[in-house]
Structure formats: C-alpha cells, structure tokens
C-alpha cells in the first residue's frame, strides 16, 4: 500500500482544513518546498498536493510552488485543485507531474475526463470528495445529484484507473477513515482506490493495509505527530 503525505497549499503555505471548511484553515508549515524535501528524506514514495486556492477559484494560484517542488524533489507527485480544462492538465503533465487529479471537473464535464484519459491514460485520477455519500464540487461548497458509487462506476467506464475517496466529514478530524464507505467503493470498481481523510495513527494504516487498499493519503496526522510517516511507509509497504 502506497503512502502519500499531503501538502495542501493556500496562500503559498501548507495548511490543513477541518471537514473541508475553507474558513477553518490551520497553517501547518510555512515552506511547502522544505516540507516536500522532508517527506522525501523520510522515505515518501509519492506526494499528494492540492491547490486549495485553485479548488475554490478554479485557477492555479500556487503554480510556482508546485513547479519548484516537481522540478527539485525527486519523488512522483500527484496534483489536484482547480484543474478544469485540458490546457491546465497539459501544463501539469509537461511540468513533470506524475498524476493529475480531477474533482469538480469530473462531476461537471465528463467530456473533459474522456479526453484527458485518452491523452494521458493512467496519469489521470479522479477525486471523489463526498458528504453523506454525495460527491461535492467547487471546493466542497456544492453537492452533486449523484451517488458516490455510481459516480465511481461511471469514471471506471470512462477508463479512469485511480480514484481518491474522501469522506469530507472525516477530513482533518483525526477520527479515522470512513472504512465502510471506502470499502463499498473499492468493492464496486476495479480501479485503484486511495483512502483520504481522517487517518489518525498507525492502527488506521494497518486497517487499510489489511483490506488491500491501494493507497492512503496522510495529512494532519503527520503534522500533528499522531502518526510517523516513516512508520506508516514501513507498515504500508510490508
């Protein structure tokens, strides 16, 4: 199981949100570049980066920082947040990003997902950020009219190979993942499913590993020191 430490960017700093609320941000590190280097030194196999300004405004507010990390930190990186057209996807892929995450765009523009998968295949992931099983869009401010399982199946049919599932009510809470919803999705599709939101400690990592989940995104737990990244990678990889 791959462990992906998270760097969420807002105003050029690393922040964590509570339950996806943009007004609840806590600055957890002032220098995202140094944070990425630290994660690499601790054995990170992949980095998960989200441009929260972009998620809300639909534009790449933190592109310079992302670019610096991609070019100077020798670890595969996936990036999401505000990526809503093929030009932005092209830009990130050309920059050297290993995987581009579509969220709002996947809910609102299926044609974009089809085109992106045709062009970039496994380099396209879709983030399913759900409230009570309903995918949310526009920086988690609006709810869609579809069920998260149906949406996951629809993305699988298009050819998406990686889904990132977040229960927004768990995000940033350190309360553990919504394992029940996560496993329903995992058992409904053949895609690689990455767990995100709520992971607190090594027991959560062990639970996900036991269920053969493809990956786990860890954020607040690392910054709050309730989870050792090195230990998580050690457990996840064995």
UniProtKB/Swiss-Prot annotation:
Family stated for the protein in its record: Belongs to the HisA/HisF family.
Primary localization: cytoplasm
Pathway: Amino-acid biosynthesis; L-histidine biosynthesis; L-histidine from 5-phospho-alpha-D-ribose 1-diphosphate: step 4/9
Entry-linked Gene3D superfamilies: Aldolase class I
Active site (UniProt): 8, 129
Annotated NCBIfam families: 1-(5-phosphoribosyl)-5-[(5-phosphoribosylamino)methylideneamino]imidazole-4-carboxamide isomerase
SUPFAM superfamilies xrefs: Ribulose-phoshate binding barrel
Source organism: Clostridium kluyveri (strain ATCC 8527 / DSM 555 / NBRC 12016 / NCIMB 10680 / K1)
GO MF annotation terms: 1-(5-phosphoribosyl)-5-[(5-phosphoribosylamino)methylideneamino]imidazole-4-carboxamide isomerase activity
UniProt protein name: 1-(5-phosphoribosyl)-5-[(5-phosphoribosylamino)methylideneamino] imidazole-4-carboxamide isomerase
GO biological process, one term: L-histidine biosynthetic process
Catalytic activity as recorded in UniProt: 1-(5-phospho-beta-D-ribosyl)-5-[(5-phospho-beta-D-ribosylamino)methylideneamino]imidazole-4-carboxamide = 5-[(5-phospho-1-deoxy-D-ribulos-1-ylimino)methylamino]-1-(5-phospho-beta-D-ribosyl)imidazole-4-carboxamide
EC number: 5.3.1.16
Name of encoding gene: hisA
One CC-aspect GO term: cytoplasm
Pfam families: His_biosynth
CDD domains in UniProt: HisA
HAMAP family, per the entry: HisA
Subcellular location field: Cytoplasm
Highest taxon listed in the record's lineage: Bacteria
The protein's enzyme class: isomerase
Key words of the record: Amino-acid biosynthesis, Cytoplasm, Histidine biosynthesis, Isomerase
């Amino acid at each position: 199981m791959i462990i992906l430490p998270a760097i969420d960017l807002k105003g050029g700093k690393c922040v964590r949100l509570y339950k996806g609320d943009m007004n609840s941000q806590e600055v957890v590190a002032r220098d995202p570049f140094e944070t990425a280097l630290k994660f690499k030194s601790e054995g990170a196999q992949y980095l998960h980066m989200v441009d929260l300004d972009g998620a809300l405004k639909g534009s790449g507010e933190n592109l310079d920082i992302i670019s610096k990390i991609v070019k100077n930190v020798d670890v595969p990186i996936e990036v999401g947040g505000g990526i809503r057209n093929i030009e932005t996807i092209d830009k990130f892929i050309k920059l050297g990003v290993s995987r581009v995450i579509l969220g709002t765009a996947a809910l609102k523009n299926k044609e974009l997902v089809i085109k992106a998968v045709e062009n970039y295949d496994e380099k396209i992931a879709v983030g399913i950020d759900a409230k009570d099983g309903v995918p949310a869009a526009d920086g988690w401010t609006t709810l869609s009219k579809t069920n998260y399982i149906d949406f996951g199946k629809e993305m699988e049919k298009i050819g998406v190979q990686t889904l990132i599932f977040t229960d927004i009510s768990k995000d940033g809470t350190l309360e553990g993942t919504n394992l029940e919803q996560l496993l329903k999705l995992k058992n409904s599709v053949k895609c690689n499913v990455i767990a995100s939101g709520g992971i607190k400690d090594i027991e959560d990592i062990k639970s996900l590993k036991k269920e053969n989940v493809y990956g786990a995104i860890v954020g607040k737990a690392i910054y709050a020191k309730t989870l050792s990244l090195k230990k998580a990678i050690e457990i996840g990889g064995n």
